[in-house]
Swiss-Prot record:
This is Queuine tRNA-ribosyltransferase. GO terms for molecular function: metal ion binding; tRNA-guanosine(34) queuine transglycosylase activity. The active site is at 89 (proton acceptor), 264 (nucleophile). Belongs to the queuine tRNA-ribosyltransferase family. It comes from Hamiltonella defensa subsp. Acyrthosiphon pisum (strain 5AT). One of its GO terms (cellular component) is cytosol. Pfam families: TGT (PF01702). The keyword Metal-binding applies. NCBIfam families: Q_tRNA_tgt, tgt_general.
Length: 370
């Protein structure tokens, strides 16, 4: 993978990620394919939304169907028939969300299989091996994801262990002769001092890109933006910057303003399944009775398949009847909304009018600029 920085507007960056499997324009949003699928959508439909890269979940794919089954097909691209680049997380976030079901040690994490109760073990080395078998174009280091809030003593200890795990991840990644990209993950909670220590430690190890983890876990948005304001100028300009798990449209806009290149979140598809649809002027809750007789398109400004063919009344009907087609059409729209937003942000950076775009964006959705 190579990163090309093409233009800046303030701190916002326009660029490209170059893979053997294709190009990714940045800033980019990655739809999440937890179990080897972006829920309810085919690869062709994902491509039609404008998405160029997706995210796969190492932890869940390791448990089901298992890396051996995926290897029978070749790799994850062949298994799910997505031929573009794939980023896989390390499994750390999912393991640490198990709480009482897991035990953290220096060597790794032991936990109970959430499906059958058997004891299994995940380490930095094992995570690198799984992601190699998945054929991940971008591999993430194994790290600890401390809960919010956490006291400073625990946060410091966790960050230091994540640095040691990052070093082990890098060493085993190299030993496996993996030719794809490996990203480090900056931890440290809301402490700028710990964030600085984490970043400097990762820079000494050396990675192809740098992710910011441990945000969007319940902290006020102002705190998240404070951490981004601190970190982004300190990450080398020639490396991509990835803000993990952040997905509200306004958070994407603020991340781009601060110099973030990559985002992922389940929000577009999860909200779609719950009838919460992102449109130019905010959010439509399609199951509300007011849409029962509304024959207008979901979003007149949107060019997705759903908006070109169906009315709000029809989508309301599908949602009320729990029809699977409703979830599919809603997902197509929400993912396209996110891709349109990223394309608009890229175009605004190219034309050096990002702040004008941001002001217009907030006026349309009825929020103030952060």
């Amino acid at each position: 993978m190579k990163y090309q920085l093409q233009k800046t507007d303030g701190r916002a960056r326009l660029g490209k990620l170059i893979f053997e499997r294709g190009l990714v324009d940045t800033p980019a949003f990655m739809p999440v394919g937890t179990y080897g699928s972006v829920k309810s959508m085919t690869p062709d439909e994902i491509t039609e939304t404008g998405a160029q890269i997706i995210l796969g979940n190492t932890f869940h794919l390791w448990l089901r169907p298992g890396q051996d089954v995926i290897k029978l097909h070749g790799d994850l691209h062949d298994f799910m028939q997505w031929q573009g680049p794939i980023l896989t997380d390390s499994g750390g976030f999912q393991v640490f969300s198990l709480n009482s079901m897991r035990k953290i040690e220096e060597k790794g994490v032991s936990f109970r299989h959430p499906l059958n109760g058997s004891e299994i073990f995940l380490s930095p080395e094992k995570s690198m091996e799984i992601q190699l078998d998945l054929g991940s174009d971008i591999v993430m280091v194994f790290d600890e994801c401390p809960p919010y809030p956490s006291d400073l003593i625990y946060m410091k200890s966790s960050m230091e262990m994540s640095l040691r795990w990052a070093n082990r991840s890098r060493e085993h990644f190299n030993n496996l002769n993996n030719k794809n990209a490996l990203f480090g993950i900056i931890q440290g909670g809301l402490s700028l001092e710990l964030r600085e220590t984490s970043l400097q430690g990762l820079l000494q190890i050396g990675f192809d890109g740098y992710a910011i983890g441990g945000l969007a876990v319940g902290e006020p948005k102002e705190e998240m933006y404070r951490v981004l304001d601190f970190l982004c100028p300190r990450i080398p300009d020639n490396k991509p910057r990835y803000l993990m798990g952040v997905g509200k449209p306004e958070n994407l806009v603020e991340g781009v303003r601060r110099g973030i290149d990559m985002f992922d979140c389940v929000m577009p598809t999860r909200n779609a399944r719950n009838g919460h649809l992102f449109v130019t002027h905010g959010v439509i809750k399609i199951r509300n009775t007011r849409y029962k007789t509304d024959i207008s398109p979901l979003d007149p400004d949107c060019d997705c398949y759903t908006c070109r063919h169906y009315s709000r009344a029809y989508l309301h009907h599908l949602d009320r009847c729990n029809e699977i087609l409703g979830a599919r059409l809603n997902s197509i729209h929400n993912v396209r909304y996110y891709q349109r937003l990223m394309a608009d942000l890229r175009h605004a950076i190219y034309e050096e009018r990002l702040e004008c775009f941001v002001e217009e964006f907030y006026k349309k959705i009825g929020l103030s600029i952060s």
